[in-house]
Amino acid sequence: MSKQQIGVVGMAVMGRNLALNIESRGYTVSVFNRSREKTEEVIAENPGKKLVPYYTVKEFVESLETPRRILLMVKAGAGTDAAIDSLKPYLEKGDIIIDGGNTFFQDTIRRNRELSAEGFNFIGTGVSGGEEGALKGPSIMPGGQKDAYELVAPILTKIAAVAEDGEPCVTYIGADGAGHYVKMVHNGIEYGDMQLIAEAYSLLKGGLNLSNEELANTFTEWNNGELSSYLIDITKDIFTKKDEDGNYLVDVILDEAANKGTGKWTSQSALDLGEPLSLITESVFARYISSLKAQRVAASKVLSGPKAQPAGDKAEFIEKVRRALYLGKIVSYAQGFSQLRAASDEYHWDLNYGEIAKIFRAGCIIRAQFLQKITDAYAENADIANLLLAPYFKKIADEYQQALRDVVAYAVQNGIPVPTFSAAVAYYDSYRAAVLPANLIQAQRDYFGAHTYKRTDKEGIFHTEWLE
């Protein structure tokens, strides 16, 4: 009896759609789910597909060609460990487990180490694109043993999204947890993008009182230019969608933004690495404060503040917000890629930042036209410390910073919260400042804790008895 070329464990929507994607590229696929009903459901809903169901782990593993290639699409955390433990008794040395879940990168590092010691290969793989991407072509970020990756690369290359230039949106990222780390930062950037867009929406509503149709038209125009991206594209559609009662749906959606924790992981890692990931972290905090709905409603009746005044000329203000949004987006990506550099150094991954930007160009949630600009920047200078220093991004910052400053000033004066726009200005000015007031902080630390300090006028480490 012939054996299948790859197996997929986990028949929730992402696992199901990836299995169908793989099958559609000409591969035979074994499928397994912990609950029999899920597997039966997938088979019943997809007659004629080369999906072969198995109902015990042993039969599933034995159905695969060697070295076995097994894609795990199960709940991250304990669920992943349990799935691996159930597979191990039936695996042989050299078999490959691919974890395609939203896994914390430190867990991937641990699993890679443990499984390697037992002779198995483990590829922690970030998969972005949601349900549709999984079925039609996601952006794929694999990390682990390079030789094991080569054995699964043909499949991953065939199922990945394809950019406009014909290149598949998959590349080997690096050792152990590198793939899941890049996916984590991708998700952090996604948080930043979404919050920046939400603040632009708030400014256009609060400052110009634009109707939903006007908002949709504005975002349609934006999507035809520098801001062309998946998130801008779907946002224009959201503005005009109506419910069964004829109401604009976005206007009746509760203003509490949920999260699954991946943005938090990105910010936690930034703290561990000493990286100033301020904009993305503010986007995480913005979701947290949005969840305090009852407190916010109560506070709105107690705490005073300015009432938003008209922002002036409509076309002029819309253009200012557009420019502010684009520069804010650049700052967000500059922070994210700076963190990737710090992580690459810390974990010895040797990341290729230009290649990472390339695989974000299609399939994933943050896909955008300007990602090619990032690839170009790293092609010109692979060692550039920060994307803001690249010629294209410096030019945009020179031209657009006044709009960002004007928009933030308007928002502050009119009581419109813009945490990520504000963070973009603060980061930009801090990064370009040759001198910051941190000298005073060092003096304070030395005063109360004898933490010492360095001087600008002489070498050495100093401590002062401040009360003498």
Curated annotation (Swiss-Prot):
SMART domains, sorted: 6PGD (SM01350)
Subunit comment: Homodimer.
Binding locations of substrate: N102, S128, G129, G130, H186, N187, Y191, K260, R287, R445, H451
EC number: 1.1.1.44
Catalytic residues in the record: K183, E190
Record gene name: gnd
Role noted for this protein: Catalyzes the oxidative decarboxylation of 6-phosphogluconate to ribulose 5-phosphate and CO(2), with concomitant reduction of NADP to NADPH.
Organism (species): Salmonella typhimurium (strain LT2 / SGSC1412 / ATCC 700720)
Pathway assignment: Carbohydrate degradation; pentose phosphate pathway; D-ribulose 5-phosphate from D-glucose 6-phosphate (oxidative stage): step 3/3
Keyword annotations of the record: Gluconate utilization, NADP, Oxidoreductase, Pentose shunt
Keyword set includes Cytoplasm: no
UniProt: NADP(+) binding residues: G10, M11, A12, V13, M14, G15, N33, R34, S35, V74, K75, A76, N102
Reactions performed catalytically: 6-phospho-D-gluconate + NADP(+) = D-ribulose 5-phosphate + CO2 + NADPH
Similarity remark: Belongs to the 6-phosphogluconate dehydrogenase family.
GO cellular component: cytosol
Group of enzyme by EC: oxidoreductase
BP GO terms, sorted: D-gluconate metabolic process; organic acid catabolic process; pentose-phosphate shunt; pentose-phosphate shunt, oxidative branch
Name of the featured protein: 6-phosphogluconate dehydrogenase, decarboxylating
Lineage: Bacteria, Pseudomonadati, Pseudomonadota, Gammaproteobacteria, Enterobacterales
Molecular function terms, GO-annotated: NADP binding; phosphogluconate dehydrogenase (decarboxylating) activity
Record PROSITE patterns: 6PGD
SUPFAM superfamilies: 6-phosphogluconate dehydrogenase C-terminal domain-like, NAD(P)-binding Rossmann-fold domains
